[in-house]
């Protein structure tokens, strides 16, 4: 089990060169059994709505997406980042960011990730859905589902896990029974959830495609798709 930084990758974004040098010196390996990401990139459909698209991350690379991070300005989700980690090296992290917020201050951070002590190493995003505001112009919620990679390259979906007791008076769009294995982030004007989009069996997300709508000053995130690759074990 492991704990990733709860401040997320602000440090990675600000100190990328230093972090890269440290990871090169000593990046702990997940296990003795390395795995590979193979084959072509398979994109999912969009959860939410299409717009001007930006790919965040390296779909053909060796990193898997383990979380997403979004920030707003003036109630508009103008910033989105994917959090990724090498599938064989715990701690070899990186972030890909699309920031359309401009120079003005931002607020209202929203983050979903497989980064708590409750999740095993090599747990990556396999499915995602977004929640929209009431006129379907801005993403106001994120939820992810994941899969855990074993030493043979098999990807096992995380089973639903519910707390023993739930608060039936939950607000802001949360279900009475929240799946603890499907991290969720909500803003107060989350109005309606869009469809789940999911990587094909045996695949994990290696990048995301973020869609921004025609709103300006700043533009708002309207949808997200996953870019997926197959996981395979290596021969001894």
Name every feature range the model reports, one short phrase each.
Residues 6, 10, 27-28, 164:
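Intrinsically disordered, low-complexity repeat segments enriched in small/polar residues
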Residues 30-236:
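Lectin-type carbohydrate-recognition ectodomains
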């Amino acid at each position: 089990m492991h704990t990733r930084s709860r401040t997320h990758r602000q440090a990675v974004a600000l100190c990328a060169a230093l972090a890269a040098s440290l990871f090169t010196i000593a990046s702990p390996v997940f296990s003795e059994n390395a795995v590979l990401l193979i084959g072509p990139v398979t994109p999912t459909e969009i959860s939410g709505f299409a717009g001007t698209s930006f790919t965040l991350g390296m779909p053909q690379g060796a990193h898997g997406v383990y979380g997403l991070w979004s920030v707003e300005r003036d109630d508009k989700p103008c910033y989105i980042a994917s959090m990724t980690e090498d599938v064989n090296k715990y701690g070899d992290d990186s972030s890909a960011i699309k920031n359309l917020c401009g120079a003005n201050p931002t607020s209202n951070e929203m983050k979903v990730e497989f980064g708590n002590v409750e999740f095993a190493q090599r747990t990556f995003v396999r499915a995602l859905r977004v929640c929209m505001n009431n006129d379907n112009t801005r993403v106001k919620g994120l939820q992810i589902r994941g899969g855990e990679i074993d030493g043979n390259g098999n990807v096992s979906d995380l089973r639903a896990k519910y707390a023993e007791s739930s608060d039936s008076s939950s607000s802001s769009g949360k279900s009475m029974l929240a799946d603890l294995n499907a991290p969720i982030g909500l803003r107060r004007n989350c109005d309606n959830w869009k469809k789940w989009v999911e990587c094909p069996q045996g695949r994990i997300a290696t990048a995301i495609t973020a869609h921004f709508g025609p709103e300006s000053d700043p533009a708002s995130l309207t949808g997200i798709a996953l870019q997926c690759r197959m996981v395979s074990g290596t021969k001894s």
